[in-house]
Amino acid sequence: MQITIKAHIGGDLGVSGLGLGAQGLKGLNSAASSLGSSVDKLSSTIDKLTSALTSMMFGGALAQGLGASSKGLGMSNQLGQSFGNGAQGASNLLSVPKSGGDALSKMFDKALDDLLGHDTVTKLTNQSNQLANSMLNASQMTQGNMNAFGSGVNNALSSILGNGLGQSMSGFSQPSLGAGGLQGLSGAGAFNQLGNAIGMGVGQNAALSALSNVSTHVDGNNRHFVDKEDRGMAKEIGQFMDQYPEIFGKPEYQKDGWSSPKTDDKSWAKALSKPDDDGMTGASMDKFRQAMGMIKSAVAGDTGNTNLNLRGAGGASLGIDAAVVGDKIANMSLGKLANA
């Protein structure tokens, strides 16, 4: 597994402190420890998602074989060892997929929708709630195909989390499937491409789902708030809005009993993530939703959204900056899926 870590020498790693003797070395050691922890966390996220998605793709059919033969149990052991979980982890993972039952399953199903078409997936789901059993045949349930699929998922997630969703998607194309759908796939290369497609699909859909489901509430006549669980993401969006005051202006607030709103002295990032009791006006919340729409378009690759062509006063590209925020939201969303 190859992970690209973007670090700015001096700032991120504390190298600028090397000339300060013991204090500089202490700073470097602390930064190195922090970087190591970040790499471990990143690897854990990738491993958890790879194991879970491989289980969803192959687990339903294999689960039936676990109690039927020692061969089935052996494949369980091999799959667990392949992803660092051992026999115990594999036995837990190889359960019947809960199609649509949890957040990651929904992202998996959506990735299949994008790949096969919603009608096909719905038809197969109606025939059996075990998607893997309906989509793959017995001859495809080999260790080599599972390893290749897992490697493809791993590579896709490593690219998204290391290089950014936008850059990863720019060089990606969906695999071409014949009339046989997934059952027409044969060989490690085909299953590696399938895993890559599922990994990319899950990453993109995780970001889009997060942006589509930001929860808000109203307290009083014109006091709007982002709910606490979404304020981390709202802060990222607010920082994007702060880069373009000529487009989004400043947030406004209006106390109960006031005839008109006033401009807040807070940045968008702070007003959204750390609001006081006044929150922001409905008009300001609409601007937040406008910004979310721009970021969703960037994540989805929607070149038809002309807002992405706008430029700031200094010439900065709104579309590029929206894509950068989309990358951050994809990473945050994948982390949440892995730890759900």
Curated annotation (Swiss-Prot):
Keyword Secreted: yes
General function of this protein: Elicits the hypersensitive response (HR) in the plant upon infection. Harpin elicits HR in non-hosts and is also required for pathogenicity in host plants.
UniProt biased composition (Basic and acidic residues): 262-277
Membership in a protein family: Belongs to the harpin HrpN family.
A single cellular component GO annotation: extracellular region
InterPro entries: HrpN/Z
Protein name, as recorded: Harpin HrpN
Compartments in which it is found: Secreted
Keywords, sorted A to Z: Hypersensitive response elicitation, Secreted
Annotated source species: Dickeya chrysanthemi (Pectobacterium chrysanthemi)
Protein's UniProt keywords contain Lipoprotein: no
Region (Disordered): 254-283
Source species taxonomy: Bacteria, Pseudomonadati, Pseudomonadota, Gammaproteobacteria, Enterobacterales
GO biological process: symbiont-mediated perturbation of host programmed cell death
